[in-house]
């Protein structure tokens, strides 16, 4: 699991905006200690059951690239506000990846060898068709295309859960707080590592974990 190309937006602006409900003016200014104290109090209120006080956290936006296994991706997709910008695709490119470097350490090497064999056989089969090494009358062309589809599907469905892909994601501190609380002690080491990264985000601990045992 790896996180890279991280951008955090509207941190100070959202901290200031957290005070809007109790103000009669709404100008932007530098963040001061009073603002931080207010946000910590809001965090404490959230962590004791009043989640509405954490609304301002939705304004602190985070964009990043995440590289992780298919297994983690399936679980990540349940978070509505963890949005995909774009991602690598096994559906389009499974036969083009360097499989020697695409799996995490928990994938059985025998499975990787099976995948390599299937991909090599598929690519050789396609090359033979493209270069006319297989005689092609009209009837045979249909059979070859069906065989090609079948072999590709075998590769897709044989590919193990430890295959790693990269996606660009966008989310906010409120969503990341939920992920952190739910996943910090998860069985998958990828989730624990991801939660450790969340802790490094600017002021995340102060704004999201103050007064909470999860910190």
State where each predicted segment sits.
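Family-specific signature for flavin-dependent thymidylate synthase
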Residues: 1-215
């Amino acid at each position: 699991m790896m996180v890279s190309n991280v951008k955090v937006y509207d941190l100070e602006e959202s901290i200031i905006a957290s005070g809007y409900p109790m103000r009669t003016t709404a100008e932007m200014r530098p963040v001061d200690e009073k603002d931080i104290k207010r946000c910590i109090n809001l965090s404490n209120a959230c962590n004791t059951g009043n989640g509405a006080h954490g609304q301002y956290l939705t304004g602190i936006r985070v964009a990043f690239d995440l590289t992780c296994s298919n297994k983690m991706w399936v679980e990540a997709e349940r978070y509505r506000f963890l949005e995909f910008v774009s991602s690598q695709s096994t559906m389009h490119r499974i036969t083009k990846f360097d499989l020697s470097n695409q799996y995490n350490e928990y994938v059985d090497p025998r499975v990787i060898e099976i995948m390599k064999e299937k991909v090599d056989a598929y690519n050789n089969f396609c090359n033979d068709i493209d270069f006319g090494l297989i005689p092609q009358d009209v009837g045979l062309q249909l059979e070859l295309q069906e065989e090609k589809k079948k072999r590709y599907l075998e590769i897709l469905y044989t590919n193990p859960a430890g295959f790693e892909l990269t996606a660009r994601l966008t989310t906010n501190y409120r969503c990341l707080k939920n992920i952190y609380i739910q996943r910090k002690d998860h069985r998958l080491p990828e989730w624990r590592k991801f939660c450790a990264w969340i802790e490094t985000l600017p002021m995340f601990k102060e704004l999201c974990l103050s007064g909470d045992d999860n910190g």
